[in-house]
Amino acid sequence: MASRRKSTTPCMVLASEQDPDLELISDLDEGPPILTPVENAKAESVSSDEEVHGSVDSDNQQNKKVEGGYECKYCTFQTPDLNMFTFHVDSEHPNVVLNSSYVCVECNFLTKRYDALSEHNLKYHPGEENFKLTMVKRNNQTIFEQTINDLTFDGSFVKEENTEQGESIDVSSSGISISKTPIMKMMKNKVENKRITVHHNSAEGTSEEKENGVKASQEENAESVSSSALESNTSTSTINRVHPSPASTVVTPTAVLPGLAQVITAVSAQQNSNLLPKVLIPVNSIPTYNAALDNNPLLLNTYNKFPYPTMSEITVLSAQAKYTEEQIKIWFSAQRLKHGVSWTPEEVEEARRKQFNGTVHTVPQTITVIPTHISTGSNGLPSILQTCQIVGQPGLVLTQVAGTNTLPVTAPIALTVAGVPNQTNVQKSQVPAAQPATDTKPATAAVPSSPSVRPEAALVNPDSFGIRAKKTKEQLAELKVSYLKNQFPHDSEIIRLMKITGLTKGEIKKWFSDTRYNQRNSKSNQCLHLNNDSSATIIIDSSDETPEPPAAAASQQKQSWNPFPDFAPQKFKEKTAEQLRALQASFLNSSVLTDEEVNRLRAQTKLTRREIDAWFTEKNKTKALKDEKIEVDESNVGSSKEEPGESSPGDETVAPKSGGTGKICKKTPEQLHMLKSAFVRTQWPSAEEYDKLAEESGLARTDIVSWFGDTRYAWKNGNLKWYYYYQSSNSSSLNGLSSLRRRGRGRPKGRGRGRPRGRPRGGKRMNTWDRVPSLIKFKTGTAILKDYYLKHKFLNEQDLDELVNRSHMGYEQVREWFAERQRRSELGIELFEENEEEDEVVDDQEEDEEETDDSDTWEPPRHVKRKLSKSDD
């Protein structure tokens, strides 16, 4: 205990002498809990290098003291050991303290023994020496509350002026600051727990108190409190009580978050971070806190943008700043505690969504201008803002707060609202002296007077309230060079620009999109000649790098240009079919958007300007006009066969230049065979495969693309029966069969279509049933079943799947066919129809004649349809 700071003030007081008015304020009272100063006796921490001042007792007698030790007030006992002193009081003066307890306010740790409290301090507060013990009495129980001295993160003491109303006193009492109360106990409800309070100096205070407040911020005061009953010793660093002042302006998050474009968020700039209300928690009470991160510009910039980073952002920051993720997380948590930022998860998501979507909501805005003598007279703090460029929406009201000794503002402040044409003047009014400061709008910000406002010295960080920062000259130069090469950058180019410029992928894509948009709508293509003037006004828009047009041009485009466009997310999947049809029709007419076309589409589709522009940009980038076609009615597709020479609407759209008649030439059997074989290999050929097919088949590439699209549609609807045949057959057998058919076409004219006389019925076809199926078997399907039945005489369930695949019939159809054969066998009638073999041969002949049909979907011949309809009947 030798290293612990000690006080000569005894820790114990007789219970009978305890003033009942000195009890702790009930937690049920309204407002923040404020501990009444204990004026009786207390043990306070005193620095080892500071002198210990003796206190005057009720008889005004000076007591002897032991340097760094304890002495008993009621006898001559003196000891440097607190444990021995406690034992002495318990044994010699048993009525002094009854039922004592020790509480660590920082950790809510409660114990009956001081030894346990010491062990707790060694374990959870290692190296901490700034403890202060305060004795309070509650319900006949003496409680010693241990708190830590009010050191802020930068190691300085915070003093707040005592503006107590009523009976004036010359000296202020020492107590526990409200900021030392645990955060969860500071406010009583959810809304108050997140309030941000900006304290102004009370205009009702005397000038004498103001002068004392200025001096108190520059030096340390040692104040002693006289008491008629007991003596007390104060520490050299006095922590004054905090009283609610009517001059404080309370800003709730509901007023701050929607108005992210207000000037109040400028207070969160890093240059003025030490001026904000701080939660007074020592740095060494936070585990693994690294103070070196306080000077890291990357972390400071990220915190100014958004105080709640995501895990991915923390990972990136860890890689860039060369610190661990845990250190960065703790640093962000400490900064939020330091600046009093406490948002719920819902508010964090809402603020993040508004920031990255770029929405700026209209909120009544009031800027309070405080004269310099008022803003610095109460607490000695420097001006909150030196110079500021106000970036926001119209309707700003500039007011001046008047105190008891009102002085005129030295010079009017000129405020420029960016993005609003002809917005040059801002109203200014004078507030009467009797009007309290609480009558101002909920969203207020303190702005000191300054001779002029320089736009180039803007301390407002636009990213801190959802507005993107203006790009630097180097970033714009890289973007312009890339834009001149390609207006639609690829992913590799975007990644390269991200590495060079440090911008995000969304910012780069948005810059390209807005540059294309501005180039289309600019008469003289001035979008590339960017204005590099440092004093240019920040435009709250994605086109912040484009110059403002001349006054005449600005007046002409005032109706069509919105300074606050809607930044709706580009969700293409949410567009309805009617919206897509309208966009497609407009794109087919012209791929270049005009203002009239955009306005028409906005009225027709109810889409935003950004969504329409993004959709057209994506269409131009992918060059997908040739691949996308207007689908025909599903009831007609697949149910009726296209006549020879008839083309689909998609074919007319894709290949309108073939003869000018909208018809495409017939495909030869070899071309169809080549396309079908390629379709079996892949339904989605690559660009190289399309080129190869066009070269080998001699067809136009657009015809091949159109054929694949129609074939995919037919395959999806189950109207592509030749697919299984090509899938199970090899190319050599197909080539052989096609060559045999071509030789068969050269038969004599007098020869009929019947079977050769010397050819036995079904001779070769019954040798083996598992040979490569011919087109005849594929067309009817029953020939495969017949060969299987002649070989096995019954249906084996293990072969059912193979029979279904080879015959292209359903499972029930195959079973019914074999059941019919079994029924015929039991009745003793003919197992097979007499004309079945002839139909097969005739089918071969019909196939020879219809092979040149370039229909994309296959259908059985008419005579097979008639036979199938009879079997169904």
UniProtKB/Swiss-Prot annotation:
Widely expressed with highest levels in brain. The modification Phosphoserine is found at S45, S47, S48, S202, S648, S774. Residues 740-764, 863-873 have a biased composition (Basic residues). Forms homodimers. Heterodimer (via HD1 domain) with ZHX2 (via HD1 domain). Also forms a heterodimer with ZHX3 which is a prerequisite for repressor activity. Interacts with ATF7IP and NFYA. Interacts (via homeobox domains) with DNMT3B (via PWWP domain). Residues 272-432 are annotated as: Required for dimerization. Induction: By interleukin-2. There is a cross-link at K159, K441, K485, K629 (Glycyl lysine isopeptide (Lys-Gly) (interchain with G-Cter in SUMO2)). It comes from Mus musculus. Keywords: DNA-binding, Homeobox, Isopeptide bond, Metal-binding, Nucleus, Phosphoprotein, Repeat, Repressor, Transcription, Transcription regulation, Ubl conjugation, Zinc, Zinc-finger. This is Zinc fingers and homeoboxes protein 1. SUPFAM superfamilies: beta-beta-alpha zinc fingers, Homeodomain-like. Gene3D superfamilies: Classic Zinc Finger, Homeodomain-like. It is found in: Nucleus. One of its GO terms (molecular function) is zinc ion binding. Residues 831-857 have a biased composition (Acidic residues). Residues 284-346, 464-526, 569-630, 660-722, 777-832 bind DNA. Residues 831-873 are annotated as: Required for repressor activity. The modification Phosphothreonine is found at T36. Residues 50-63 have a biased composition (Basic and acidic residues). Coiled coil: none annotated. Belongs to the ZHX family.
